[in-house]
């Protein structure tokens, strides 16, 4: 290993051991990993300190309203034009993009899967993405895709950016390190992270886990933001201070590297002679972040009835129609159940929205059996769903005293658009053939006579 590589490795290790973050959501941050690297009083000096290049990364049109205008200024060792050369076609056949109407024989229905098994071969994060559903059209920046991932090998000299959308990553098994152009995030199960559209990054494992598994929402539309609280007021749900954006960190590495790109559903790769993660300082509001789901402050019914699940929204990606989401990220965290003379689990429902669910930890209160950590369920537009027979009987007859629903964390990617199943998902060996039978015990109780049955 040459001296430059040793210094780069030492610098990366030292940086990783003291990861720091800046609190806040949508803030205009500033950070530098070398003193004086960040220009003061202007964005684009004639010459930057340390011989750096100034470059702007825009996440919105220049003329977007101030409240939705996103950009960051990066001060880097090389400009991004040096981070791509001639592209070659690449293939990741299990990562699909909307519109995707794969041919398969699985008919319409409510669906549930056990966890995707750990890979037998070596897979990086990029190689381990498996698309379950797609919705909308990435080329028109509408809709989303829901993926699962499994991997057991680090992206060492491989880097990736997604021009089709931002990536919301939800680890379920194994902590990961996400090294982006703008800093490093360590993310463990019960945390999430978001990598903005077009931002270069690589993913590695951390800790003792030999394989990592989780979920990804690829959001093609308007970026995720915090939902309006309405009458809830100024506090609760996901509070801005609990979102953490990494401080600047860079990788000064001179060796053959590969940059992979996803653009309008196709993959490309280019070879360069250095790391593209070379941003020494930056300022702006277009940035990655992480969030600990355990800091979510839930609200709920303190008298009777079960409120709509929208009260559990962590993030929402809006459309032009007010209150109609391109995709919502919703969680079902630990909480107290105290409603009186009320059926406390989620009620039976048919919905214009399409719901992709995963379970990070514990049990889900409407499905105590069959829906396991690492599992997936899909309840598509207007298909009925709700508690299974066991959960219904238990909740209908239990003594209604205050109960702490603990040791649980389920989530949902909910979109306005129908979610089309991929061939991979339709033919996955972990698909539960007997899922629909969970409602078989819901027998007729009506006999025409009044009274509680």
Swiss-Prot record:
Residues given in the record as Fe cation binding sites: 349, 355, 385
A molecular function (GO) term: homogentisate 1,2-dioxygenase activity
Nuclease listed as a keyword: no
Chain residues that bind homogentisate: 364, 385
The UniProt record lists the keyword Metal-binding: yes
List of catalytic residues: 306 (proton acceptor)
A Pfam entry, by short name: HgmA_C
GO cellular component: cytoplasm
NCBIfam families in alphabetical order: hmgA (TIGR01015)
Protein name: Homogentisate 1,2-dioxygenase
Organism: Rhizobium etli (strain ATCC 51251 / DSM 11541 / JCM 21823 / NBRC 15573 / CFN 42)
Organism placement in taxonomy: Bacteria, Pseudomonadati, Pseudomonadota, Alphaproteobacteria, Hyphomicrobiales
Gene coding for it: hmgA
């Amino acid at each position: 290993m040459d001296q430059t590589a040793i210094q780069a490795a030492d610098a990366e290790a030292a940086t990783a051991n003291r990861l720091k973050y800046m609190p806040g959501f949508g803030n205009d941050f500033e950070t530098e990993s070398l003193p004086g690297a960040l220009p003061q009083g202007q964005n684009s000096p004639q010459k930057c300190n340390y011989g750096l290049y100034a470059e702007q990364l825009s996440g919105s049109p220049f003329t977007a309203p101030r409240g939705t205008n996103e950009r960051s200024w990066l001060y880097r060792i090389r400009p991004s034009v040096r981070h791509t050369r001639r592209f070659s076609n690449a293939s990741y056949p299990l990562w699909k993009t909307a519109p995707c109407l794969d041919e398969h024989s699985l008919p319409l229905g409510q669906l549930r899967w056990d966890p995707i098994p750990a890979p037998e071969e070596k897979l990086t994060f990029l190689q381990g993405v498996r698309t379950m559903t797609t919705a909308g059209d990435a080329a028109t920046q509408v809709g989303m895709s829901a993926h699962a991932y499994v991997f057991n090998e680090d992206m060492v000299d491989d880097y990736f950016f997604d021009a089709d959308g931002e990536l919301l990553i939800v680890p379920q098994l194994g902590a990961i390190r996400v090294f982006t152009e703008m800093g490093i995030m360590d993310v463990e199960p019960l945390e999430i992270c978001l990598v903005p559209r077009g931002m270069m990054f690589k993913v590695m494992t951390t800790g003792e886990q030999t394989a990592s598994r989780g979920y990804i929402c690829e959001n093609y539309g308007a970026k995720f933001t915090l939902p309006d609280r309405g009458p809830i007021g100024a506090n609760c749900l996901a509070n801005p201070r609990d979102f953490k954006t990494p401080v600047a960190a860079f990788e000064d590495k001179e060796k053959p590297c590969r940059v992979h790109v996803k653009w309008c559903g196709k993959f490309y790769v280019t070879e360069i002679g250095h790391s593209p993660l070379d941003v020494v300082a930056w300022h702006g509001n277009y940035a990655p972040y992480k969030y600990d789901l355990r800091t979510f402050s839930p609200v709920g019914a303190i008298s009777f009835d079960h409120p709509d699940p929208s009260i559990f929204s962590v993030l929402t990606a809006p459309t032009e129609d007010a209150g109609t989401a391109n995709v919502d990220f919703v969680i079902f965290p630990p909480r107290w159940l105290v409603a009186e003379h009320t059926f406390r689990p989620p009620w039976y429902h048919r919905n214009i929205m399409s719901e992709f669910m995963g379970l990070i930890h514990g049990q889900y209160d409407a499905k105590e059996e069959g829906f396991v950590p690492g599992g997936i369920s899909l309840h598509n537009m207007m298909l009925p769903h709700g508690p299974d027979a066991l959960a219904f009987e238990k909740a209908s007859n239990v003594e209604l005293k205050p109960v702490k629903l603990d040791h649980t964390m389920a989530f949902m990617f909910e979109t306005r658009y129908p979610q089309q199943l991929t061939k991979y998902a339709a033919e996955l060996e972990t698909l539960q053939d007997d899922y629909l039978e969970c409602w078989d015990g819901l027998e007729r109780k009506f006999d025409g006579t009044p009274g509680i049955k």
